[in-house]
Amino acid sequence: GCNGNKKKMNGEHDLDAANITLDDHTISFYYNWYGNPSVDGEMKHWMHPIALAPGHSGDVGAISGLNDDIACNFYPELGTYSSNDPEIIRKHIRMHIKANVGVLSVTWWGEGDYGNQSVSLLLDEAAKVGAKVCFHIEPFNGRSPQTVRENIQYIVDTYGDHPAFYRTHGKPLFFIYDSYLIKPAEWAKLFAAGGEISVRNTKYDGLFIGLTLKESELPDIETACMDG
């Protein structure tokens, strides 16, 4: 039939062997903060405080993460998995490949965070199938332009030579989540070419993408000297 020459990619071997051209302009945001007792000794991030509706106050408890009562809109097909489980990482990578997603932007809460434990394995598995990994810098405790610079240095120094480390036009890509929490003029110290702690024209230069919540905030990205 018409699909007679189409290669099926049902298993690991098929994905590894197939001649796949991934779209490295298609990026997913990948959260590697989940844990479970069998791998990590406890549940992580499957539980969550219940958020109150606007205008309400008080303590309405939390979702326990136990007995399938998890903080998730849909129950995951892979169950309450651990982000440190190598088999889970392999399955996630292959889901991305089947969707032709070329880059995973992994959430980053700092060097000592639980999520950092799986970054090396994520990079290794991505490299096997030609996928790439970039980083999504979250509002970690103590985040400032200075500590963001320190984290950029750590990421580039630790992972920058890995074949799966994503670069575009020779530069790594970083997303800065909730960048509006810090004043644009403060960010400019880091991202302006003449800033006090600038990464520009250094080995830590990159493409830095901020976050706005409304159109009126778009000029703040330019003031911060971010790239988008």
What are these regions (language model features)?
Residues M9-G228:
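Glycan-processing catalytic domains of CAZymes
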